[in-house]
Amino acid sequence: YKRQVYEREGAGYFLKNFADFFAEDDLTVVNLEGVLTDNNALYPRDKGKGDDGYWFRGPAAYAKVLSAASVEVASLANNHAFDYGAQGFRDTIAAVEAEGLGWFGTYNKNRDPETEKFYFYTKDGVTICLMSLLWDDYNPQDPNGNGAYLRQQITEIKQSGQADAVIAILHGGQEYGRHRTKPQTIFTKMAISAGADLVICHHAHVVMGMDVINNRSAFYSLGNFCFGGNRKAYQENKNRTPAVQDAAPALMLRAVLTFDDDGTYEGQQITLYPVQTTGIDRAAGDTVQVNNYQPKFITGPLAAHVLHLSLIHI
């Protein structure tokens, strides 16, 4: 169905409500969660879940959805980047680069070296490094040593002078959970102690709380944004634990980092914008909200509710 919408409406349809907003900033960054490939010979990677797993893919042309809306960079460190194996990942990189977008991400420190990449952005003599990492939230012992690897990379980048500020995007947590997990807390504190100036987490699909650590902001989940995984943006499901009830509302974050004349980092100003993943509102009493794949800004009581969720520190 998403492909029908793409063919009927064009690439500019999906992020139409944000294109002008994104064009105002220096850099728009998204978490691209899925495989973009035209290779029909690729098969879904075995996730050990039988038919219960989720595999996300779309044609390479879907990268135009990002470029059409002034998105400049995509993080590829997430649990769906390898849904169709290493070749699917490489095809995604090719699709993104063909649209002039940058990308970054470390899927796992033991993966193919080509999957490790940081993104450096320089303006007015100041350089910001974007890095992202996926970890196994179901194995908090971190057998792959990703935590130590993350700390090492941030420390090296800051101490070597490669970047004046580091933004770490971490992928992990409990899907549809309202509270941060222990590994989330550990990895976030580890990143900031190593020198990260801003930490943003993804994976939960719903809005979680935030924290301030050593004058650095940490956001544990912004929720979904333009999400094609479900035809229904909201469907009350009391049989699932936790119940899926607030997957439509989400947050978009704008960060303004300030530096002195010598390029020394001075501070940050964070603005949160309440959004929802669909342009179709849910009427009072409805247990289903249709997803038209066109997120929009929201205001009023729902926006206030979403902002309240971001203030939960538990």
Language-model region placement:
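Acidic, metal/ion-coordinating pockets
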Residues: K2-L311
